[in-house]
């Protein structure tokens, strides 16, 4: 099956990256192990067929993760985003652009998670931080949406360039927005907790 082949490829990639000093086994091995243990959850989200193209001649792909557990909600975006980013990066100068949109980003890009090991959390955040910091060079962009900006990695928040701010009520979130957006005036900050 394609998922098993993917896991095998991930193991080979891990071995290659560790031998080449490009990855730390402790960061990647937990991700692969979690992937192996969550095949059923992944099957709820994705249907794997031979020679399948994620885009299938479409410009937009929506992956709905509402029916899976929290761990899978973190794994699927990580795996897909990392794969697409690396494909784009390896193509060199590419005229096409990729915009990865992460809704409920505070669930995926958070330091606050206590359900996972530190190594896995570090790896997950490192992947998304690289995409948001380096992706523009390769035509890869990220759009994130969240009701809890204070829960998102500060490295990721610091790389954002455009903001649509709606109603925020939590003081930590208001402070995060105020600290992140240097050009936000006092009147605008005071209007955030509408």
Regions found by a protein language model. Give the residues of each.
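Conserved ATP-driven motor cores of ASCE-family P-loop NTPases powering translocation/secretion/packaging/pilus
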Residues: 124-194
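P-loop NTPase motor domains
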Residues: 1-130
